[in-house]
């Protein structure tokens, strides 16, 4: 795409002449008070005032509004004239079909600059948004308010401001404000109420500012990165190149869901095109028809061919050399900064596609398998007695879903060489059908299947002929009866069960807990405990999908002396963030249909955000190294050569950093809120259930948690919400983490969980503490 000015220098001359005439005529009076309408009325555009016409090529142009106006001027006449010019330009651009308009930002330095001027500029932009309902407005701002970029040119309206208005404000900026440009943008978009059609065109300087400022702009809706010719350096061959820091900046922005365009400024004309005095494209010199003469053609052929657009060629070459996307980047391509409602697997039966997304994780289930293998290895090595008298370790997966953890548990058992008594429990009737199919086709009938809510399950049972390892299918309906109740019906007389042994479905009988392969119906089955309890009930904030409530409800089935829970513990963490895109999506996209949209949490793959609480720059590297050293327990070693199948390829999870890697962001300060442990050592005394005396019931008061945290804010910014993460210890030495400070060391490349986002209904402006 190309840029084109919306108006010509002739239009500028007309406006300046009209303004000068008006001001010179009314030198002794304040015409802003004596006239009801605008003191200076700008006439409509004429054909000579604009190079644009509504044709087929108009969609390939970015319209640029006049840079000589001053929307933030303290002089009301200058500000009013500027608003009229902007309104005329955008109205005509919208008529022609321009969909992108580039508007120079407010003056950040110089006499008359103030916060009230920024608010005045924002009001003008808010009015401009109404000029074209389908037009995107890009506010052109520098990354920092560099005084060298704030030069005034001949014909600018700013010098026309009258002295009596300039005296009312502090003229010169006292010192360089690195966040001044961002703060001006923050005020503009806040006053305009975060419209989706208002974005940023960011001018990149030759010397990049600190990483904290780069990260702040990364979180904003930047749609254009503009590079001036002076930003480039020359290599040994004389071609323009960018520094490594600039390359890293571009690489980071390219990873955004909506990657910005790159706009090259003042890098020379496009071959074959030049402009006349009005900015209109004309043919290159040559014959009247645009063709070169014979002499010109011969001279062109005699010269060696050179790249006519070296800056453009370099940027295209840089684009092709971007690093290969990681598994996490490929998986999350469509999820970046996309608000999702957290799952409720306890109350809603999940669809197969939801399970499938989780099962694509290259890390999670490999780490679960390692945790199970370690637990089995330690169980036998420490000589712990098993709950099953036949010597097999009783392993139960509660909430089995489509069975990935069951498969991993069976593999771990084979690799370590420890035989297990495998149980799988699932309440979703649809997923339970698939589990039974897996038991036939994949697991070779090695798994006991139970359809039940884990909180009402009475645990594994052993028939009288327990020496036969017959695998069973159980079906718990809802009335609280199990196989013991069925066997003792009719005044204690055992009742024969007519069931099939094909394991293709639940028996269609009036019982509530049926043993599908009872060899001796007259015998009373014996319940026994679970040695290793496995679950994957964690949510994005650890406990937000009721993992503590569910596991507390099944803890009475766990071996009270040696029982192991995988996971063994988990901790929730939070940090304040700036997330303008998420705030705008909730404000405009969800609040209309759900008035409480800003008061519920969301699961989000956070990308275009900025951490507000970070370590000082001098401590970032040391903190990162300390975190890695303290949390990197190393890849859990396999217990046999066969167990190496769970190793993750180096290229996916632990690829070495390359020289083209983006500049690291500041290390966020992430606070710990609360933790849960399983088995829970402080579980209250259970009482008989209302459904059945054999199913204990406990209250949930012990799971209440509150936390108050304080975060230092090194740089001023706007807090839009709280980001939540978790860390979990599956088994000693095997951990999972979504905490950005520890994830790479504990479970790099994991994609099963996105962070949770707690939005603020009203944004909170944070001032710098340093």
Predicted regions and their residues:
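Class I SAM-binding transferase module
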Residues: 1-283, 287-343, 350-352, 359-360, ...
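Buried hydrophobic packing segments
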Residues: 372, 406-409, 554
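Conserved class I S-adenosyl-L-methionine
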Residues: 389-401
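Hydrophobic alpha-helical cores of multi-pass transmembrane domains in eukaryotic membrane proteins
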Residues: 401-402, 534
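Conserved SAM-binding loop of SAM-dependent methyltransferases across substrates and taxa
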Residues: 402-418
